[in-house]
Amino acid sequence: SLQRITGVSIDRNSGEGSTVTVRGFGPDFNLVLLNGRQMPASGLGSCCEAPASRSFDFGNLAAEGVAGVEVYKSGRAALPTGGIGSVINIKTPRPLDRPGFKGSIGVKGVYDTSRFESTPVTPEISGILSNTFGDGTIGILATASYQRRKASQAQFNAGWREGYLGSENNWGSLPLDANDWRGNFARTENRPDPTDIYQVTQNAGYDFTDLDRERINGQLVLQVKPTDTLSLLVDYTYSQNTINARTSSVGVWFNHDQTSSSWTDGPAAGPNFYSEAFAPGKDLAITGALAANRSINRSIGGNLEWDGPGGLRLVLDGHHSTAESKPTSPYGSNIAVGSAIFGVQSQKVDFTTDMPVISVNMYPGSAADNAANIRPAGNAFRNAYMRDEINEVSLKGGYDFDASFIK
């Protein structure tokens, strides 16, 4: 729903809203508050390292536990500083806002057709329970939600060598000499002109990822209003977001030796296709990877509000909040096992289709579908941890003037 606001765009991760960009300023430049309090942020980014970022991940919070969102795109004296792009305040329910007994439970299933192996239905359960006592002077509220989602995604990736001018003659660039000893000049169709800019494919591959995400949210609120002018509130918020991502990758690398290619017209030219032939010994790269991480946010706070005589208002607020991201696997936050099948005779990437097509021809006896031909190529075990903590106490005041010269 934030995307409906002018100047606000959503950055998505695996199809779900994660961070926001406001007025062109990225997530690092937007300050996120929870009930007016600055929240810590943690995450493991690409699952291999803790990023140097304070951007808040909205994927940690379920929409069912949010009562409203305020977006401030300009500064105000009553708001914390630090939001260059915006200040976003997430508001959660309060029991005295709706006196009496209130309760709701929602159960639904999510049917995701993106799964490679099956199309499972995953559960989403949420509930809210609120009640007031003592003629509406004491209120207790509890919210909870559980969400599980399984999805898959397929992706094509390509790496490129730095941009070349059509007049360059360096390693990796297209040959200029018609008598090139490799014969690549004759196998280059519609070669870029000397003043054109182009890039050469360095590598290409397919990634197939299965995602399993579990999100748990909960909040407890105690609100007391002994008099019409005094209100006390204590709340505790908990969120947990666990993500497992299993990725299988297959790809090719180019040596830029015996190549054939076709190119689009300049001045910025790109390949229609790029292929290369090899002597025995070239490999087809295969990788299996697992990223398993969990982010946990905890916040406990209190708020005391007093409406004094003559329009005077004082608000004392404090909270202790932590955000922690760590691996759930005993082998670390990210594991990658690399292997190779040696015996690639030729390889080609065709960029003329909606999804670029990689084709590989193997030498006899080196079939890619024969597990006996797979050789280990290297493993990587990475471990990352991030923790952010905020202890904050604030005292705010206001005075409503009631004079004829102030409108």
Regions from the PLM with identified roles:
Residues 324-371:
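Surface-exposed, extracytoplasmic segments of Gram-negative outer-membrane nutrient-acquisition systems
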Residues 4, 17, 55-106, 153:
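A beta-strand signature from Gram-negative outer-membrane beta-barrel systems
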Residues 70, 95-131, 142, 158, ...:
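Short strand-turn segments of transmembrane beta-barrel domains in outer membranes
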Residues 86, 92, 109-110, 121-132, ...:
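Outer-membrane beta-barrel transmembrane strands
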Residues 32-34, 43-45, 81-83, 152-156, ...:
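Short, solvent-exposed loop/turn and secondary-structure capping segments
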Residues 30, 65, 99-103, 136-140, ...:
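Outer-envelope beta-barrel architecture signal
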Residues 43-49, 112-117, 137-214, 239-282, ...:
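Surface-exposed beta-strand-turn/loop segments characteristic
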Residues 1-28, 36-61, 70-76, 110:
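Periplasmic N-terminal accessory/gating domains of Gram-negative outer-membrane beta-barrel systems
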